[in-house]
């Protein structure tokens, strides 16, 4: 095998660069361990979502805002792969591109960062809470209808700065981003799924590459976490059937459980002695309005996560969830 430099596209935010560098570090270790002659370099790309910061996500085009320019660079051969936050990836990828690998998922929860150190239920009546998504707004208002939800855009560091400078009582951010940046000490409280169900794929990364790049796909397969890939596939199919983007409050979280309802050992991975058939996927899904939400839960065999996500979405729609 000849030596090759793999060009990795990424947004230029501090979080995007940090998680891309972490992935490259892991891939370098895997390449050394398997004797693969690959090097990696980073190419920064500005996306539409990075350029437009004064408008809410729901008003500027929905899903794909943070990936379209990167995907085009991949199709044009300017880059070979890209590291995305999975929650930013559209449920349907452009022809010629695939999700080549899904590393082990980090914390999927949302995190509350409060100026006063108060938890969500302790915030004063009419507290100003900053968030960037309709998904969070819908669920927070279902939990605390008195809250004043206001949009806050920008990178993690700029949102944290706005918390101090713009008079918010609190802001909501994805826990995984704060943890990847080493900023867990800023978190006041983590929000449970019954209060704020996470975005599809939240906490997971997607490594996108060209479908015809067999050499790179072989490398990425070494980095893929099968259990994360299964659960994220179910969530993404749920989203695709609902045809949702940033304009609709949609959330979903899937995890693996043993047939008796117990979660797998080892941080979400199946123990080596477990038979795959003993595991089931459990998915909780939500589609809501600006001030309400509806839930449906179910479970199925782990072998068919895509069909499962589709079935759960169909059942939720039949029970009254409507995406308009």
From Swiss-Prot:
Q: Where is this region: Insert?
A: 261-279
Any GO BP: protoporphyrinogen IX biosynthetic process
The record, for Pfam families, names: Porphobil_deam, Porphobil_deamC
Q: Which GO terms describe its molecular function?
A: hydroxymethylbilane synthase activity
Q: What is its EC number?
A: 2.5.1.61
Please tell me one Gene Ontology term that the record gives under cellular component: cytoplasm
Sites of S-(dipyrrolylmethanemethyl)cysteine modification: 246
Cofactor binding, per record: Binds 1 dipyrromethane group covalently.
Q: What class of enzyme is it?
A: transferase
What the entry lists under InterPro entries is as follows: HemC (IPR000860), Porphobilin_deaminase_cofac_BS (IPR022419), Porphobilin_deaminase_N (IPR022417), Porphobilinogen_deaminase_C (IPR022418), Porphobilinogen_deaminase_C_sf (IPR036803)
Describe the reaction catalysed, as an equation.
4 porphobilinogen + H2O = hydroxymethylbilane + 4 NH4(+)
Keyword line? Porphyrin biosynthesis, Transferase
Q: Which cofactor does the UniProt annotation name?
A: dipyrromethane
Q: Is Transferase one of the keywords UniProt gives this record?
A: yes
Tell me which SUPFAM superfamilies the record gives. Periplasmic binding protein-like II, Porphobilinogen deaminase (hydroxymethylbilane synthase), C-terminal domain
> According to its UniProt entry, what is the function of this protein?
Tetrapolymerization of the monopyrrole PBG into the hydroxymethylbilane pre-uroporphyrinogen in several discrete steps.
Similarity field: Belongs to the HMBS family.
NCBIfam families for this protein: hemC
The record's misc note reads: The porphobilinogen subunits are added to the dipyrromethane group.
Q: What subunit structure does UniProt give?
A: Monomer.
Question: What is this protein's record name?
Answer: Porphobilinogen deaminase
Q: Which organism is it from?
A: Paenibacillus macerans
């Amino acid at each position: 095998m000849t030596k090759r430099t793999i060009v990795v596209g990424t947004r230029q935010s501090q979080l995007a660069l940090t998680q891309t560098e972490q992935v490259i570090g892991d891939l370098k270790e895997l390449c050394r361990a398997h004797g693969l002659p690959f090097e990696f370099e980073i190419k920064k790309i500005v996306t539409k979502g990075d350029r437009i910061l004064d408008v809410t996500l729901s008003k500027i085009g929905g899903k794909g805002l943070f990936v379209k320019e990167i995907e085009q660079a991949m199709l044009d051969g300017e880059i070979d792969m890209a590291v995305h936050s999975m929650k930013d990836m559209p449920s349907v990828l452009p022809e010629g591109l695939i999700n080549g690998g899904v590393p082990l998922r980090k914390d999927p929860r949302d995190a509350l960062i409060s100026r006063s150190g108060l938890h969500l239920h302790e915030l004063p009546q009419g507290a100003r809470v900053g968030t960037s998504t309709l998904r969070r707004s819908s669920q927070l208002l279902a939990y605390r209808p008195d809250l004043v939800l206001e949009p806050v855009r920008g990178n993690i560091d700029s949102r944290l700065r706005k918390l101090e400078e713009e008079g918010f009582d609190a802001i909501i951010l994805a826990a995984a981003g704060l943890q990847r940046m080493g900023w867990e000490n800023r978190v006041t409280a983590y929000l449970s799924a019954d209060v704020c169900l996470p975005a599809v794929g939240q906490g997971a990364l997607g490594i996108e590459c060209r479908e015809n790049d067999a050499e790179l796909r072989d490398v990425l397969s070494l980095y893929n976490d099968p259990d994360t890939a299964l659960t994220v596939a179910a969530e993404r199919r749920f989203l695709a059937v609902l045809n949702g983007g940033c304009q609709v409050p949609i959330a979903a979280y899937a995890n693996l459980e043993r047939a008796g309802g117990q979660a797998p050992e080892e941080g979400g991975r199946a123990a080596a002695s477990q038979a795959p058939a003993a595991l089931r996927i459990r998915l909780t899904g939500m589609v809501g309005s600006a001030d309400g939400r509806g839930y449906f839960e179910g479970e199925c065999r782990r072998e068919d996560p895509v069909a499962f996500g589709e079935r759960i979405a169909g059942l939720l729609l039949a029970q009254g969830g409507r995406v308009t």
